[in-house]
């Protein structure tokens, strides 16, 4: 499998490069970075103390011409450019970017009619198993329990709530037969009035170097149930992304997520 990494100089990009180098079935063939990155021209393994022979570049077409699959954990505007290049070169995509607009998501979905794409806000195996637990819990706590989702991330995260928190909200809302768009409450301030019992609340914390903590709270009278997932390292995201690459290698065009990759549907 010939793999390229987008955002190669970032925290997640470095973790992905290491995961590819440690996979005997994978070959690192490209490392993309921003056009204004000070690391352009450096070896992709520099941050790991290794030589890979692959230089960081901003030349999309040069990288996509060599790759079978691109792994992309960047930002929406970058990912949209990568989708266009992937369509030109018939390259598959594993996308962990979050913060897309509805229009961008529609473009991503349209692209999946021509190339294989795994798109998931969180590729950790633990998070995706947690989603199944939430579906089960929501069905049994559908009456008399208030549902709140609390997430915490590092100070550099630019979108809120996190994509993972929204995935959890979608899982709970779907299990209850609701649309998250109709019942989500994003933060509270001032005099809000009594809580709507059908709502799903979100609260976001940003600070320090928190990799990612997510708790879904089912608060009833006399008891509360908390289902929590905590990430202590980005390694789990990188390992999940590699599983997604392996999954796509045997598939054609289509839009998939980690539930498909892990056989949880």
UniProtKB/Swiss-Prot annotation:
Keywords: Amino-acid biosynthesis, Cytoplasm, Diaminopimelate biosynthesis, Lysine biosynthesis, NAD, NADP, Oxidoreductase. Its EC number is 1.17.1.8. The keyword Disulfide bond does not apply. The keyword NADP applies. Pathway: Amino-acid biosynthesis; L-lysine biosynthesis via DAP pathway; (S)-tetrahydrodipicolinate from L-aspartate: step 4/4. NAD(+) binds at residues 7-12, 33, 96-98, 120-123. SUPFAM superfamilies: Glyceraldehyde-3-phosphate dehydrogenase-like, C-terminal domain (SSF55347), NAD(P)-binding Rossmann-fold domains (SSF51735). NADP(+) binds at residue 34. The active site is at 153 (proton donor/acceptor), 157 (proton donor). Catalyzes the conversion of 4-hydroxy-tetrahydrodipicolinate (HTPA) to tetrahydrodipicolinate. Belongs to the DapB family. This is 4-hydroxy-tetrahydrodipicolinate reductase.
